[in-house]
């Protein structure tokens, strides 16, 4: 996976395919701020709801088709919020 820095201000991390940050090669977002930043997977989900979880404090996972398997995940380095506080554009 890639290491991403958004810098100061609001950032949107856009993904168009699940393999771009799948559990085998997930990206690390090194400065994710839940009050400003968001993850956009609308090209994958087309508005459908997703299931989310946060494990080990910083590993954020999404089930993009609600089949019980997490297809995408990110390491949100230094993240201190909850899974529900991560803004995901679907």
Residue ranges of each PLM-predicted region?
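Low-complexity acidic/polar repeat-biased segments
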Residues: 47-90
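Acidic, glycine-rich calcium-binding repeat modules characteristic of RTX/beta-roll
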Residues: 1-48
């Amino acid at each position: 996976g890639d290491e991403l820095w958004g810098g100061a201000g609001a950032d949107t991390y856009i993904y168009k395919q699940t393999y771009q940050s799948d559990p085998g090669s997930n990206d690390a977002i090194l400065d994710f701020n839940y009050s400003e930043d968001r993850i956009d997977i609308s090209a994958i989900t087309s508005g459908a709801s997703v299931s989310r979880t946060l494990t080990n404090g910083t590993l954020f996972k999404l089930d993009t088709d609600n089949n019980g398997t997490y297809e995408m995940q990110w390491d949100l380095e230094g993240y201190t919020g909850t899974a529900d506080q991560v803004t995901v554009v679907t």
